[in-house]
UniProtKB/Swiss-Prot annotation:
Record HAMAP family: NrdR (MF_00440)
Family: Belongs to the NrdR family.
Record organism: Pseudomonas putida (strain W619)
Domain of life (superkingdom): Bacteria
Gene: nrdR
Protein name (Swiss-Prot/TrEMBL): Transcriptional repressor NrdR
GO biological process, one term: negative regulation of DNA-templated transcription
PANTHER family in alphabetical order: TRANSCRIPTIONAL REPRESSOR NRDR (PTHR30455:SF2)
Cofactor(s) needed for function: Zn(2+)
Cofactor details (free text): Binds 1 zinc ion.
Length: 154
């Protein structure tokens, strides 16, 4: 690593510690050339796969768009921000676990539906009605009946 003081290429690590609940490594470094010490922090860069939209276009995963969609479905529902954030983290974890560089947006939609179903059934129906483009009351009834018949998967 380059020394931020003199620009030399040769630095040595004199101390390493886990910080941020094990999510980061803090390193104390010393420049071999000038002797100055400095601190660096390392975190794993966890890249989420790109999304393949239904029309075939590709776009980067957008966590804010995902959060906004889930918040819209959960509007005025008794679900804490902590539970929403945990659901978002679970969705991102499942996407990373695929090991794929690209996933179809349908995969994300199904993961969102599964998480919303565990959080709040009304929010699940709200999201499903938009996501699956319900056209009439019969489609709502069918989904509600299916919800009543099939237990949510944990």
């Amino acid at each position: 690593m380059h020394c931020p003081f003199c620009g030399a290429n040769d630095t040595k690590v004199i101390d390493s510690r886990l910080v941020a609940e094990g999510e980061q490594v803090r390193r104390r470094r010393e420049c071999v050339a000038c002797g100055e010490r400095f601190t660096t922090f390392e975190t794993a860069e966890l890249v989420l796969p790109r999304l393949i939209k239904q029309d075939g276009t590709r776009q980067p995963f957008d966590e804010e768009k995902l959060r906004a969609g889930m918040q819209r479905a959960l509007e005025k529902r008794p679900v804490s921000v902590e539970r929403l954030e945990a659901a978002l983290a679970h969705i991102k974890s499942r996407l990373r676990a695929t090991g794929e560089r690209e996933v179809k947006s349908l995969v994300v939609g199904e993961l969102v539906m599964a998480e919303l179903r565990k959080l709040d059934e009304v929010a699940y129906i709200r999201f499903a009605s938009v996501y699956r483009r319900f056209q009439d009351l019969d489609e709502f009834r069918e989904e509600i009946d299916r919800l009543a018949r099939e237990p949510a998967k944990e």
